[in-house]
């Protein structure tokens, strides 16, 4: 069977049998991979640290009919700070679940790999909630369904009058076209400006945004509906993340 190498981030590790785990990886070279790691749960396993969720590791894998098998692995980055708070680990779990849900197996996207790596690094001390919102938009853009925010997504005209966001129409909607939208969410220009900043600013600058709780809740609603529309299902992480939805908004250095 063919051996291959992968620089990959562990999205999920599920127990399987005595001492084994089934890993879901997102790799730079091969995209999403599912692989069996034998004996890694045993206390004496040298591979144990390299297969923990949210760890970047170098893998040597053997191709199989149904599942590939981990032959060797070595941890590169472990992001220990993620395990220091429930909020950080919750958002790390969410971005990992989102990548797993949105990507097919075996289709590499190097930009997505590095975006995931960046957000895991920035969760150390950044605004986890806004980093997650920016990640959602940037992933959608990378995968080809970026929401339209500069004009009406239905008539392509200027955004004037009452403004809305429609998942079914693919973005912002003007007051004249809202009748064509299913379950539109009313927004204002401030909300759209924040969405544009989250989409266009580098992740490292997202901490400069000062966004109050009202805007955060509206943006969370919009993007959750948008992703659910494309995924056609809810993500398991939502229920856990809702526990942090009423946390005080972090202060920053720039208004939008």
From Swiss-Prot:
Keyword DNA repair: yes
Gene3D superfamilies: Nucleic acid-binding proteins (2.40.50.140), Recombination protein O, C-terminal domain (1.20.1440.120)
Keywords assigned: DNA damage, DNA recombination, DNA repair
GO cellular component: a single term: bacterial nucleoid
SUPFAM superfamilies per record: ArfGap/RecO-like zinc finger, Nucleic acid-binding proteins
GO biological process: DNA recombination; double-strand break repair
Methyltransferase among keywords: no
Annotated family: Belongs to the RecO family.
HAMAP family assigned: RecO
Entry function: Involved in DNA repair and RecF pathway recombination.
PANTHER family per UniProt: DNA REPAIR PROTEIN RECO
Protein name per Swiss-Prot or TrEMBL: DNA repair protein RecO
Organism: Pelotomaculum thermopropionicum (strain DSM 13744 / JCM 10971 / SI)
């Amino acid at each position: 069977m063919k051996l291959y190498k992968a620089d990959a981030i562990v999205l999920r590790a599920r127990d399987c049998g005595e001492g084994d785990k089934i890993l879901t990886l997102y790799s730079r070279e091969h995209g999403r991979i599912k692989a069996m790691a034998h004996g890694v749960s045993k206390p004496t396993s040298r591979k144990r640290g390299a297969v923990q969720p949210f760890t970047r590791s170098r893998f040597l894998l053997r191709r199989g009919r149904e599942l590939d098998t981990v032959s060797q692995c070595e941890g590169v980055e472990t992001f220990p700070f993620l395990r220091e708070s429930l909020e950080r680990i919750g958002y790390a779990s969410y971005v990992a679940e989102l990548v797993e849900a949105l990507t097919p197996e075996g289709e590499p996207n190097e930009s997505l790999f590095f975006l995931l790596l960046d957000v895991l690094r920035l969760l150390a001390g950044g605004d986890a909630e806004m980093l997650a919102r920016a990640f959602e938009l940037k992933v959608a853009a990378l995968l080809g369904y970026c929401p339209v925010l500069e004009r009406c997504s239905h008539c392509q005209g200027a955004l004037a009058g009452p403004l809305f966001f429609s998942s079914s129409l693919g973005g912002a909607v003007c007051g004249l076209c809202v009748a064509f939208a299913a379950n539109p969410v009313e927004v204002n220009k401030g909300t759209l400006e924040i969405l544009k900043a989250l989409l266009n600013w580098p992740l490292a600058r997202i901490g400069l945004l000062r966004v109050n709780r009202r805007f955060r809740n509206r943006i969370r609603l919009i993007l959750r509906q948008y992703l659910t529309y494309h995924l056609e299902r809810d993500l398991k992480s939502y229920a856990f993340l809702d526990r942090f939805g009423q946390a005080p908004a972090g202060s920053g250095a720039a208004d939008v």
